[in-house]
Curated annotation (Swiss-Prot):
It is found in: Nucleus. GO terms for biological process: homologous chromosome pairing at meiosis; meiotic joint molecule formation; meiotic strand invasion involved in reciprocal meiotic recombination; reciprocal meiotic recombination. GO terms for molecular function: double-stranded DNA binding; recombinase activator activity. Pfam families: TBPIP. Heterodimer with MND1. MND1-HOP2 binds preferentially to dsDNA. The gene is HOP2. The keyword Lyase does not apply. Residues 97-160 form a coiled coil. The lineage of its organism: Eukaryota, Fungi, Dikarya, Ascomycota, Saccharomycotina. Keywords: Coiled coil, DNA recombination, DNA-binding, Meiosis, Nucleus. Belongs to the HOP2 family. This is Homologous-pairing protein 2. Transmembrane segments: none annotated. Required for proper homologous chromosome pairing and efficient cross-over and intragenic recombination during meiosis. Stimulates DMC1-dependent homologous strand assimilation required for the resolution of meiotic double-strand breaks.
Length: 214
């Protein structure tokens, strides 16, 4: 049985003059401009970006291809070919700058198309006009139920309950103050016992004399 290929085996990538010839042949076959990233991607990583960049630089220096810089991006294309065009076609429509402009226009159109599609998807997610009436009606009914429940609570409320609530809150405040006061006294007492008696285990000592955890 033949040994299985390891999944992490990498395809052999072109380098040096082989990479230059591969890229030049590709640009000639496509006869349109590309960035280095496009070339690497379209060649399915047969060359690395570093190798492709060096190969393109050599090809330009040897005048085997041409390049043009747009901002931070360098676009590469094969040298202009003597292509036989139909008599009704203006050759000026196929020079480097025109093709590049058309390519940029296409990118813009694709971007506009994507934006329009996102807007359409957003609109289609909204409910239909007929459904809006039902949704509004349901929301109004829910609001009426809440208002009815609130009114019922207000009608059943006994003013005397206000005094009861206030008294409970006042007593709770006094109780919390008393708890805080007694807790402080207890802690001071424990500190005094600790300094005076100096037990080996304070927790066991407190448990023996009946103190609970504070």
């Amino acid at each position: 049985m033949a040994p299985k290929k390891k999944s992490n085996d990498r395809a052999i990538q072109a380098k040096g003059s082989e990479a230059e010839q591969l890229i030049e042949d590709y640009l000639v076959s496509q006869y349109k401009p590309f960035s280095v990233n496009d070339i690497v991607q379209n060649l399915h990583n047969k060359v690395t970006k570093t190798t492709a960049t060096k190969a393109l630089e050599n090809l330009v220096n040897e005048k085997r291809i041409v390049s043009k810089t747009f901002g931070k991006i360098i676009i590469y294309s094969c040298n202009e070919q003597d292509t036989a065009l139909p008599s009704n076609i203006d050759p000026s429509q196929f020079d480097f700058e025109t093709v590049l402009q058309l390519r940029n226009d296409l990118i813009e159109l694709e971007r506009d198309k994507s934006t329009a599609k996102d807007a359409l998807d957003s609109v289609t997610k909204e409910p239909e006009n007929e459904d809006l009436l039902t949704i509004i009606e349901n929301e109004e009914n829910e609001l009426k139920k809440i208002e009815s429940k609130l009114q019922s609570l207000q009608d059943d409320w006994d003013p005397a309950n206000d005094e009861i609530v206030k008294r409970i809150m006042s007593e709770d405040t006094l109780l919390q103050k008393e708890i805080t006061k007694r807790s402080k006294i207890c802690k001071n007492l424990i500190a005094t016992i600790k300094d005076s008696v100096c037990p080996k285990n304070m927790n066991e000592f407190l448990e023996e004399i009946g103190f609970e955890d504070i």
